[in-house]
């Protein structure tokens, strides 16, 4: 690295393997990261480390079959989650780092936020403080396929639709990726895909990189004029290359990072004919339950989640034809919407009454219940700076009700030796509430079902045996 007194911008490619799909209630197993310069040349040593699972948690069997990481391996190679979080935090908070991965905005970043939340680090600052940012290559690949597909091979899945699974893309483009779902292998594969797009479609790549920033995206969005844009998102469906023309109707009434978009390729008649209550109900009805009713062609775009938005003409006529997007239909819908501005009030009303948010009484699931105050954040910093053995004597008051529970869990999971007798009893009671007879019976049945399903697969059977032994040991 050139040391000219100025900090160099770097990319930090990373990937988690986890013991389950829920970012708040499941736990990390393995983390891998590689830092590169702006041209994707590796700098520094690759980082791979494991997280020791705490004794109030059992992994999801299906997840272990995918990753091949058993809780025994994570326990043998890993450190407690407090130490695991500290290492990730120090990598993520190097100034001028762009933290990225593959599907990280929806998955890995949520895991990071929850790991930091459980371990007394700021869940969000890593992605913006000190000139830091985040980005996600999954949507870059989707955008490349839809908007500038030349020069890259695009694999199809069994349904004949484009596949954006990392292992399919690497194979189709002759990139080494032998050990898919090993965190390090996935990181190298992601770097290779980034290089591929940067070489084959440099203008698109640079555009998307610049527009990962919400202020750049805001400049594209013109609500008063309903200026149409092209949008690429997995929510739009692979059958049309995850792409459509959209128009911004209004900003979300409560979340200033969300804009309400109408999908111009959809059927807009519900927006004209139905009232906001009916629209809201239909919007939150699963597609399979809609019957003959037309879906509501409205979607939120969160400008702080690196969405792909570009000028409408970025989608060329030949690509719209290839993706089966009817340009005239979209233009007709745009004209109708502009003639019916009352639709704006309707969609704002849909989102003014938020979708039903069921609060959980489990503190692990309460990250999004609210931000911590400055005073509480300062107190949490003191927790981190205190030697674990001195935590019991820490005389500190918190305003937010979550923190006392978080601190107890933090001590019990990471430093059980610091619990006194009464606290040990409290933790035992917590574990009893987690490992109920019903839960354990369901867990055993799931392992048995998978063991029958994969009876001929020695490796999978061995993983399931290890899980069974682990459960018997810790419960």
Describe the residue ranges of each PLM region.
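Long, charge-rich C-terminal accessory regions
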Residues: 253-430
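N-terminal glycine/serine-rich phosphate-binding loop of ATP-dependent small-molecule kinases
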Residues: 2-4, 18-23, 48, 72, ...
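Entry/capping segment at the start of metal-dependent catalytic domains
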Residues: 1-41
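Acidic catalytic cores of enzymes that act on phosphate-bearing nucleotides/polynucleotides
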Residues: 210-290
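Metal-dependent phosphoesterase core characteristic of DEDDh/y 3'-5' exonuclease domains
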Residues: 26-31, 35-36, 41-69, 90-202, ...
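C-terminal non-catalytic accessory extensions
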Residues: 423-475
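Metal-dependent phosphoesterase signature
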Residues: 67-84, 91
């Amino acid at each position: 690295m050139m040391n000219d007194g100025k900090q160099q911008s770097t990319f930090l490619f990373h990937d988690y393997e986890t013991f389950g799909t829920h970012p708040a209630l499941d736990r990390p197993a393995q983390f891998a990261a590689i830092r590169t310069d702006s041209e994707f040349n590796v700098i520094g040593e690759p980082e791979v480390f494991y997280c020791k699972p705490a004794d109030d948690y059992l992994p999801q069997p299906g997840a272990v079959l995918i990753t091949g990481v058993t809780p025994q391996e994570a326990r043998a190679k890993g450190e407690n989650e407090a130490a695991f979080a500290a290492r990730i935090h120090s990598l993520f908070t190097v100034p001028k780092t762009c933290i990225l991965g593959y599907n990280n905005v929806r998955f890995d970043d949520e895991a990071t936020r929850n790991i930091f939340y459980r371990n007394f680090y700021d869940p969000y600052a890593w992605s913006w403080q000190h000139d830091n940012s985040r980005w996600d290559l999954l949507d870059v690949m989707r955008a490349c396929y839809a908007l500038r597909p030349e020069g890259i091979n695009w694999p199809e899945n069994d349904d004949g639709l484009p596949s954006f699974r990392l292992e399919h893309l690497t194979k189709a483009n002759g990139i080494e990726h032998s050990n898919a779902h090993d965190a390090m292998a996935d990181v190298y594969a992601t770097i290779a895909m980034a290089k591929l797009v940067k070489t084959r479609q440099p203008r698109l790549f640079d555009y998307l990189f610049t527009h990962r920033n919400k202020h750049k995206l805001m400049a594209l969005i013109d609500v008063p004029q309903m200026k149409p844009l092209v949008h690429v998102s997995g929510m739009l469906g692979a059958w049309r290359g995850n792409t459509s023309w959209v128009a911004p109707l209004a900003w979300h009434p409560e979340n200033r990072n969300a804009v309400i978009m109408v999908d111009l390729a959809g059927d807009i008649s519900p927006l004209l004919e139905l009232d906001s209550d009916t629209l809201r109900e239909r919007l939150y009805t699963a597609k399979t339950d809609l019957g003959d009713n037309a879906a509501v062609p409205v979607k939120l775009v969160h400008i702080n989640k690196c969405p792909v938005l570009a000028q409408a003409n970025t989608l060329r006529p030949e690509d719209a034809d290839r993706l089966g997007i009817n340009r005239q239909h979209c233009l007709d819908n745009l004209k109708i919407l502009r003639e019916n501005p009352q639709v704006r009030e309707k969609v704002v009303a849909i989102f003014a009454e938020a979708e039903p948010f069921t609060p959980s009484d489990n503190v692990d699931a309460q990250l999004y219940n609210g931000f911590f105050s400055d005073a509480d954040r300062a107190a949490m910093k003191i927790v981190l700076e205190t030697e674990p053995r001195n935590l019991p004597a820490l005389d500190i008051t918190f305003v937010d009700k979550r923190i006392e529970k978080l601190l107890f869990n933090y001590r019990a999971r990471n430093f059980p030796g610091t619990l006194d007798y009464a606290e040990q009893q409290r933790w035992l009671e917590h574990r009893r509430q987690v490992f109920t007879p019903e839960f354990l019976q369901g867990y055993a049945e799931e392992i048995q079902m998978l063991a029958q399903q994969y009876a001929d697969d020695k490796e999978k059977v061995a993983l399931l045996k290890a899980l069974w032994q682990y459960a018997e040991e810790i419960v």
